[in-house]
C-alpha cells in the first residue's frame, strides 16, 4: 500500500464567523430599546483599554452609525462595532444570560488569551 503525502490544507470550517449575536441578546436589547422609547437606538459594542487584563468590553446605545462601523441586524435590532473594536471581536459571540447569579450580556471571545474573573476584561 502506497502512502501519498498531501500538503495540509486549511479547513474552511476553522475560519471564525465574523460575529454571533444571539437571539437572546437581540431580544433583550429590543426590550431595552422599547423601554427607552426611542426606536432609532442601536447597540454599540466596543473594546477599550482598561480592566485587570488590559482590555475591557463596553456597551452603549447610539443613534448614529459611523462610517467605519460594522453593522449587524438581528430580530429588528442593529448592533454597531467600530473598526478598531471589530478586530478584537471577530469570531466572538454576544449573548444574554439569566441565571442564579443575575442577568448580564456575555461575550465569548476566541481571541482572548486570558480573561478576568468578572468576564468583562481580557487580553490578547
Swiss-Prot record:
Gene Ontology biological-process entries: iron-sulfur cluster assembly
Its cofactor is:
iron-sulfur cluster
Q: Which InterPro entries match?
A: FeS_biogenesis, FeS_cluster_insertion, FeS_cluster_insertion_CS, FeS_cluster_insertion_RrpA, HesB-like_dom_sf
Q: Which domain of life does the protein's organism represent? A: Bacteria
Which keywords annotate this record? Iron, Iron-sulfur, Metal-binding
The molecular function terms in GO held by this entry are: 2 iron, 2 sulfur cluster binding; 4 iron, 4 sulfur cluster binding; iron ion binding
Q: Which cysteines are joined by disulfide bonds?
A: none
User: How are cofactors bound according to the entry's free-text note?
Assistant: Binds 1 iron-sulfur cluster per subunit.
Q: Indicate yes or no for the key word Cell inner membrane.
A: no
Q: Binding of iron-sulfur cluster: at which residues? A: 52, 116, 118
Role of this protein: Required for insertion of 4Fe-4S clusters.
UniProt subunit comment: Homodimer.
Family (UniProt)? Belongs to the HesB/IscA family.
Against NCBIfam families, the record matches this protein to: iron-sulfur cluster assembly accessory protein (TIGR00049), PRK13623.1 (NF010147)
- Name the PANTHER family for this protein: IRON-SULFUR CLUSTER ASSEMBLY 2 HOMOLOG, MITOCHONDRIAL
Q: Mind telling me what this protein is named?
A: Putative iron-sulfur cluster insertion protein ErpA
Species this chain originates from: Ralstonia nicotianae (strain ATCC BAA-1114 / GMI1000)
Amino acid at each position: 500500500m502506497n502512502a501519498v503525502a498531501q500538503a495540509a490544507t486549511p479547513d474552511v470550517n476553522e475560519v471564525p464567523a465574523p460575529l454571533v449575536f444571539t437571539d437572546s441578546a437581540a431580544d433583550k436589547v429590543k426590550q431595552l430599546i422599547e423601554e427607552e422609547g426611542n426606536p432609532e437606538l442601536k447597540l454599540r459594542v466596543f473594546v477599550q483599554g482598561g480592566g485587570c487584563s488590559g482590555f475591557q468590553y463596553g456597551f452603549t446605545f447610539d443613534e448614529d452609525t459611523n462610517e467605519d462601523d460594522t453593522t449587524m441586524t438581528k430580530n429588528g435590532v442593529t448592533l454597531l462595532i467600530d473598526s478598531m473594536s471589530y478586530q478584537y471581536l471577530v469570531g466572538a459571540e454576544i449573548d444574554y444570560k439569566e441565571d442564579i447569579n443575575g442577568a448580564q450580556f456575555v461575550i465569548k471571545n476566541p481571541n482572548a488569551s486570558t480573561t478576568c474573573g468578572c468576564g468583562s476584561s481580557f487580553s490578547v
